[in-house]
Structures are given as C-alpha cells and as structure tokens.
Amino acid sequence: MDYTTDNPHKLGYRMPAEWENHAATWLSWPHQKEDWPGKFQPIPWVYAEIIRHIAAHEVVKLVIPSNEHKVKIRKILQASGVLLKNVQFFVARTNRSWIRDYGPIYITAEKGHKALLDFRFNAWAKY
C-alpha cells in the first residue's frame, strides 16, 4: 500500500457522490443509549428498517460492537424482514453509530484509481 501526504484533490481524486454506483453501504449498529436520551428503545428497530430498504438492493456492511451482540442484532433484522444474505457483519469497537465520523472514506480518480483517506475525526465542537 502506498501512502502520501499530498493533497488528494491535486492528485485528481474526489469523493464520489452518495448516489453514484458503489459496492456497499457501511452502517454501524446503534448501541450508545446516551445518543438518544430516553428514546433509545425503538432506535435498533429504526436502523433495521433502514437496513431492510438498503439490503433489498445492495450489500450492507454492518459494524457491530461484538460477536455477542450479533445474535440479538440478527434476530431484530430477521424480525424486520431484512434480506440477510446482503448483510455482512464486522466486529469493531465504536463509541457512536455515526460511521461517517470515523469510518472508511473512499475517494476515486479517473481511470478507476481508488484510495482511502486517513481522516482523523476529533469530535464535535460544542454547539
């Protein structure tokens, strides 16, 4: 793997639009109740509904907190009618379900060249 500190834009790379063709959608399973104070109970079911709609058309790569959680998550997904053959599970420690803050950021250039950004999210400022 090559590593560079050069500006990706100057090298001809760009971040693809969300509507462009892609291999999969990455999501992270919600598990931090503090993100939804007093409202967490329906959140896993809401995520399952989102996954159901996406997995009907493409692969979902789902980050989960542990293999122990996988059994419960699969039950929720099954009960929601998710096409499980299109869901791939990846165990990784996370502190939030907002994968855009810490997940892989793919960029692309002409002629099919692809790269990953080493993006370091350092949390939200106070708002």
Ranges and model annotations:
Residues 1-127:
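The feature marks the mature, well-folded catalytic cores of soluble enzymes
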